[in-house]
Amino acid sequence: MRNGDSKWITSKQARQDVQKFRAKSSVILSSSSTILSDNPLLNVRYKELDKKTLSIFPNKIFQHPIRVIIDSKNRVQPSHNIIKTKGKIWLIRLKSDRKIWPKNTTQIIEKDHNKKINIFSLLKFLGQSEINNVWIEAGSTLSGFLLNSYLIDELIIYMAPKILGHEAKPLCMIYEKLKISNSLQFKFKNICQIGPDIRLILSPKKI
């Protein structure tokens, strides 16, 4: 919501389902805006994984996905919750700072692109780092850019049986003036009920 209220829209079952997708990913990609607004952990709650996922990732060999945070203005601080969790964290920045960071946190410097991080360059870097499965949990700005740039292979949406009205935050920002005829087009890959909620898995239609 625009007033900052965000916990919880979906059910416990839906949130547990998200853990499965996180566990199967090499990277969880987000932005400093999400860190500042929600102060999330963005980690895998291993004990909440279903039996099938646990059988794939036994505790002895399980590794948390790398949390990659786009932070062009160095807004993420050592005091944020995500920094206090286990697992690697990469802060993608235009310049490093001299603050004391834990060993699991690395500042990675990207080239300045109009005072912003070049997302295409970042994704290329991830690919060169042999990372090929990126799970994105972000706000409307980053999500909108990725969708508008056709950089998404799958879109996963959890829908709760609630109506929030015009004060709800948008899923993504689309800055072009769209008509129905040139809207972003998707096709359904899977629809299923998760507890009281619905999970949609969509893939973009080829241009």
Curated annotation (Swiss-Prot):
Its EC number is 1.1.1.193. Pathway: Cofactor biosynthesis; riboflavin biosynthesis; 5-amino-6-(D-ribitylamino)uracil from GTP: step 3/4. It comes from the Bacteria. SUPFAM superfamilies: Dihydrofolate reductase-like. It catalyses: 5-amino-6-(5-phospho-D-ribitylamino)uracil + NADP(+) = 5-amino-6-(5-phospho-D-ribosylamino)uracil + NADPH + H(+). Belongs to the HTP reductase family. This is 5-amino-6-(5-phosphoribosylamino)uracil reductase. It comes from Buchnera aphidicola subsp. Acyrthosiphon pisum (strain APS) (Acyrthosiphon pisum symbiotic bacterium).
